[in-house]
Amino acid sequence: MSGAVVFVELDTRQDTGYTISLEWDRDTGQTQIVVADIWDASLLVFPVPGANAGDAFRHPFRYAP
């Protein structure tokens, strides 16, 4: 049985209409950005390389697919 990937929230911030979170999986080292749109309740989740995680957290739409 494979283990589930569990992300830990490292940081979160509010921007106009959005909540942006940076998450990390301690077992795999994967990082991801979560962008929640507070107006329409949509959620955008995408992986980012660890080396770019800080910049992606500050500028998520540069890195969004």
List PLM regions with ranges.
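Polybasic/polar functional segments that serve as interface/processing modules
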Residues: 1-65
